[in-house]
Amino acid sequence: MAQFQQTIDMQTLQAAAGRNSLVNDLASRRVYDNAVEELNARSRRPKVHFSKAVSTEQTLIATNAYPEFEISFTHTQSAVHSLAGGLRSLELEYLMMQVPFGSLTYDIGGNFSAHLFKGRDYVHCCMPNLDVRDIARHEGHKEAIYSYVNRLKRQQRPVPEYQRAAFNNYAENPHFVHCDKPFQQCELTTAYGTDTYAVALHSIYDIPVEEFGSALLRKNVKTCFAAFHFHENMLLDCDTVTLDEIGATFQKSGDNLSFFFHNESTLNYTHSFSNIIKYVCKTFFPASQRFVYHKEFLVTRVNTWYCKFTRVDTFTLFRGVYHNNVDCEEFYKAMDDAWHYKKTLAMLNAERTIFKDNAALNFWFPKVRDMVIVPLFDASITTGRMSRREIMVNKDFVYTVLNHIKTYQAKALTYANVLSFVESIRSRVIINGVTARSEWDTDKAILGPLAMTFFLITKLGHVQDEIILKKFQKFDRTTNELIWTSLCDALMGVIPSVKETLVRGGFVKVAEQALEIKVPELYCTFADRLVLQYKKAEEFQSCDLSKPLEESEKYYNALSELSVLENLDSFDLEAFKTLCQQKNVDPDMAAKVVVAIMKSELTLPFKKPTEEEISESLKPGEGSCAEHKEVLSLQNDAPFPCVKNLVEGSVPAYGMCPKGGGFDKLDVDIADFHLKSVDAVKKGTMMSAVYTGSIKVQQMKNYIDYLSASLAATVSNLCKVLRDVHGVDPESQEKSGVWDVRRGRWLLKPNAKSHAWGVAEDANHKLVIVLLNWDDGKPVCDETWFRVAVSSDSLIYSDMGKLKTLTSCSPNGEPPEPNAKVILVDGVPGCGKTKEIIEKVNFSEDLILVPGKEASKMIIRRANQAGVIRADKDNVRTVDSFLMHPSRRVFKRLFIDEGLMLHTGCVNFLLLLSQCDVAYVYGDTKQIPFICRVANFPYPAHFAKLVADEKEVRRVTLRCPADVTYFLNKKYDGAVMCTSAVERSVKAEVVRGKGALNPITLPLEGKILTFTQADKFELLEKGYKDVNTVHEVQGETYEKTAIVRLTSTPLEIISSASPHVLVALTRHTTCCKYYTVVLDPMVNVISEMEKLSNFLLDMYRVEAGVQYQLQIDAVFRDSNLFVQTPKSGDWRDMQFYYDALLPGNSTILNEFDAVTMNLRDISLNVKDCRIDFSKSVQLPKEQPIFLKPKIRTAAEMPRTAGLLENLVAMIKRNMNAPDLTGTIDIEDTASLVVEKFWDSYVDKEFSGTNEMTMTRESFSRWLSKQESSTVGQLADFNFVDLPAVDEYKHMIKSQPKQKLDLSIQDEYPALQTIVYHSKKINAIFGPMFSELTRMLLERIDSSKFLFYTRKTPAQIEDFFSDLDSTQAMEILELDISKYDKSQNEFHCAVEYKIWEKLGIDEWLAEVWKQGHRKTTLKDYTAGVKTCLWYQRKSGDVTTFIGNTIIIAACLSSMIPMDKVIKAAFCGDDSLIYIPKGLDLPDIQAGANLMWNFEAKLFRKKYGYFCGRYVIHHDRGAIVYYDPLKLISKLGCKHIRDVVHLEELRESLCDVASNLNNCAYFSQLDEAVAEVHKTAVGGSFAFCSIIKYLSDKRLFRDLFFV
């Protein structure tokens, strides 16, 4: 023990000496934590903007004086007395901090504009015009308001939300905001008994003290906070007092006290000195016989004194403090009234029960320390009179001078010598023989009178010294003494000493007193007395805490309820409390719902279980659930009348179904759908507004709702087709079709026949669902029908039949919970699941269910291959067949193959309908799960998990080779083994563009697989056979597979963790080859498998012996600072930079690619079109000569329009449109998307719908933007009839667009196309959509969202300049390929609904809509004519704004825009800044299924928008034009001559102006490296760009002939 104690003592000593590193680290960590806490606390302080230009010392004064605020010094405004003026805002904010927020407050003499800017709608300013200066000051306040409003109007920004209530109050009731009466006469009234507050900032000087208390009481002011300038020296009877910190002066003349700022010419303010002294020295301010306002000082800051006046009820004084005493005033009054009575009677009348209080106020004068009061004398030449005054001078200075000049001889003691010495010692002193600056800073103006006083005092001192010496040397009397002696003897001692008495009484002034030097007192005490007469006693009122205590009890109970949650730490209790208060929700009820949701006992179908969503769901609403008929709403935040209408404190045991929900009876036959109104199917089909019950029951309800939503979406789309089709189009082959019953022909021809059902329009234009029969390829229709619509989704009764069955077995909307035991068999790919099912099943009593027909036929064939018929269509069925026509048999066991690809509710219904005892669900947890195909339908994560009683695993694959088994081991728990003898089976090949893939030059061996439907259709059009997507072949086995990727844009489903990659690599048994146009994660996976050694591959075979585990570790920052970019470098620096970022592009010899394409044979996959081959031969033209660039890039020569060029461009830009969309109810979903768009982007003030009015001015605005040639084409247009709106002209741009990637090395880039209307159509619709665009942009919240239309680069930079770099945020970019041609009927519906909300004319809107539905393209140059459905036309009047609207609507439907910091949209470009950690949905899946976009979401550190890098930093943001794009333009090959070259230079100078600022080149390098992985530091190249752009001669050297 002794040794142990000794060790402890040694360690303690080492820690104390700082030699213990662990203790030092702990101490450093503690200091760091304390610093972080302090900085966080400081950042939460109120922020004050200090715009006045002040010095560094004054900045420290303001910061140290007001630590409560975080002061931002911008130094943007130079003004008189800038420090005092800037402190005014701090003083006002400090006073308002003392007032409870929202309480009615009187600002005595206040500035109402300051309160408006702060959004305080509860402040009334009493602003009397006591002189002309007050009127001018108040006009300045109004000017500030006008300037602010005009600035907002100029910037097209609305009044901010926090200011809106105050500005509305000022606009509607200005008399509440301010009045022109003094505070004592203010006429604003409040509710009786309501306490108010008051603040007085430098305004109580002008209120008489006698009126102040009564004025406060008249307004029922509880507390008044005041601030005023003062200085203690004013109590010393000084005529002038200087306030050094703010540079001001008080000057007293009689009772007038003047205040002014020195060192500048400003106004002078005059007040009553006696009135101010009373405010300073008094403590009690009587208001009535009952109430008194008690004053106490709070703090003194920068020459400003703060005090507080508190209303005191004297009736609450303790009775014992009163005493019977004589009130002096009453005594004198009684004596006057009754002088003839006795004194005793007068005393009795004056006796009262009174209370006396005495308050003493001490003032400390710190500047009088070491000071003395010295008299000064002035004489008048005219009158001969002498005046005397006093000043304070440094004590040490005075006695140093007096002691020195007392040493002068009588001849040397002259006034001139004294003045000379005083002047010299004031300016310098000699210390150790060295001259130094004097420490006494005495005013030079008083040195003359002060020297005279010193001279007189010294003279008097010499006389006194002589008298003393004579007293000691001679004992005789002087003549003066003899006179006094004679006078005293004559008076004979009546007064002991007449001389002393006369002097003491002031009748006689002696020299000693006139020249006396006095020492001032450091403290001065002022007493204030209060006398109260006893009138009444009342009890002191206590604070009412019952309400907050009751609320605390509720939240305590709610916390107790929430304590059962496992992850309570991650639950934001503070947010829960705040939202319950905002939504007016009972916390206990909300807590019960939270627990139920977290335990999966309750589910809000269309909401996430967050604090905000739960509070919103529980918010009290009007009416009951039965009143809400339209419950199904396809959006993520659809409002549900759910738990908020339940009985308080209880959770229901069953789901609530609104009126009209479900079907009228349980046993519904499919025939009941015939002639059923479409509204009955589209509305009210939700099983439950709130999912309750066990998790299995909730999954089953969700599955029924999923079928209902799918059917409703299909019916809605058929209704839309009926409304949209007007003309005849017998040549079309689309998914939808419309049959004209009366004419007996197809108005819109479908690509399939024999549909099971459709939607019919009868003679009354009523839409009903009809079941169809067919005769010779034509539907058999009732004669009362007008038209019938069908689609590919109505080919079979699938959804109807399943709904019939499932609703029949769900009485009262509550499906019974299945009791079967569920065994989940989780097997790796190829583990023999199907083989195991066939071996284990007893076909006489068991049932096998599979997803598709081919799988059921395969199982029947394999089970019966021995010759004995065991399997048939009764015991081996598809899931859809069984759900539509369930068997009446009772099965003992159920086997479901690929059960994890099914909706979990579907699996539970299969268990229920089969009535089995045990169910074996075979699947793979790592492969592709069930994918919800109905856009925006909720399928929560806890619903996707199958509830199983047992789980078995199969980890031996019979299909996969050894190299794939290695890949599987990284995906599954436990060791995965294989039985295959094949060791190496996978290869990857990067092809040089999708054009390299065709059946002739590159035949693909085995089953062809793709990841997307677009790639699948493109391969089929190229001529390949037997092509499927990976999702379609899950569960299948092939000997050889060929996986193809044609999409060059990033795909989220192709990643190392994607289940699609797992399925794709596990379909083969011997060989798999991956063909891709880009390097992607799957290439890396295959490359890793190819590098494996045979030793490692042997480990994964079942026959392998001892297994060896090898482990291999992987080896492997509001205004911009400006620094001028040096103009240095050479053009070769730009070449090097280009080659580093795009290696290989500069070596491409593409000058004759166009010639080669026209001369050689070519194979094109062309959609239906008409071609005039007479245009295939181009007329010979003289080729122009272009300048050649020194910088080698991938730029191409201009091309000549012709049949092949135009046709290739048309195929690339307009044909082969992707079709990725799932099942969407176009009309309803479009309405929801538009509402979300409106809520997200449009300012609430302009959220209503207006009627658009076309005026002459709007047409003139459009006409002024048109070229003269365009106006000339309209000269012969009579505007009587419309040209064909559905006919477009087609042309190409001659210059190919340069891509900043490596695709030029493998592809022949197609030209950009222009699809445009005639000028006559543009003249009609152009002004209309220009006006609609203007109306829309006016409504956009421009402070948060940027719609990049007619904006300059400087405006982009200004928009992003207020980004806070200290805030943790993420930057999102949505990259969409094939943007224009991906837009289909849904996109058009969204755009039209937005125009409708802006008030577009209905007739013109319908014409425009029909003109964009089915359109005809004619290319007269190439002789090509084709037909397109929908798509965005590149030369339309709505092309740019329409594309911008669509990308904004797309993102608002998937991203919570209310949480977005900044967002910008331009065409297909988008840039979004969101807080870091925000929970986002699957953007890529939403873009595919709902918006038909091939999209990829990038998360970056810096934004990239419209070819510019947005670099945000701690001072704002700077926008750099893409330097790589700039260098690419310097390598262009279409420059005609020197004039054209100079035009190019000027345009590049405009866009690249910010490259002149090199302060943020390091951040620019980081941003470029995010896009181009091979990027190097580019400062040298940027300097070279600026050098050549800024010099005409050097720029010309970049090109040669």
From Swiss-Prot:
Catalytic activity: RNA(n) + a ribonucleoside 5'-triphosphate = RNA(n+1) + diphosphate; ATP + H2O = ADP + phosphate + H(+)
EC numbers for this chain: 2.1.1.-, 2.7.7.-, 2.7.7.48, 3.6.4.13
Keyword Ribosomal protein appears in the UniProt entry: no
Superkingdom of origin organism: Viruses
UniProt-listed GO biological process terms: DNA-templated transcription; mRNA modification; RNA processing; symbiont-mediated suppression of host innate immune response; viral RNA genome replication
Binding annotation for ATP: 827-834
Alphabetical UniProt keywords: ATP-binding, Helicase, Host-virus interaction, Hydrolase, Inhibition of host innate immune response by virus, Nucleotide-binding, Nucleotidyltransferase, RNA suppression of termination, RNA-directed RNA polymerase, Suppressor of RNA silencing, Transferase, Viral immunoevasion, Viral RNA replication
CDD domains from the UniProt entry: Virgaviridae_RdRp (cd23251)
Location of region: Methyltransferase: 50-436
GO molecular function: ATP binding; ATP hydrolysis activity; mRNA methyltransferase activity; RNA binding; RNA helicase activity; RNA-directed RNA polymerase activity
Boundaries of every (+)RNA virus helicase C-terminal domain copy: 955-1107
Family matches, as InterPro entries: (+)RNA_virus_helicase_core_dom, Alphavirus-like_MT_dom, DNA/RNA_pol_sf, P-loop_NTPase, RNA-dep_RNA_pol_alsuvir, RNA-dir_pol_PSvirus, ToMV_Hel_N, Virgaviridae_RdRp
Gene3D superfamilies named in the record: 3.30.450.420, P-loop containing nucleotide triphosphate hydrolases
Domain spans labelled Alphavirus-like MT: 72-280
Keyword Nucleotide-binding: yes
RdRp catalytic domain location: 1369-1482
Residues annotated as domain (+)RNA virus helicase ATP-binding: 795-954
Ranges where the record places region Helicase: 823-1076
Miscellaneous note of the record: This protein is translated as a fusion protein by episodic readthrough of a termination codon which is expressed as tyrosine. When readthrough of the terminator codon TGA occurs between the codons for Phe-1116 and Asp-1118, this results in the addition of the RdRp region to the replicase.
Family assignment from sequence similarity: Belongs to the ssRNA positive-strand viruses RNA-directed RNA polymerase family.
Subunit structure: Heterodimer of a large and a small subunit.
Name the UniProt record assigns to this protein: Replicase large subunit
Organism: Turnip vein-clearing virus
Lineage: Viruses, Riboviria, Orthornavirae, Kitrinoviricota, Alsuviricetes
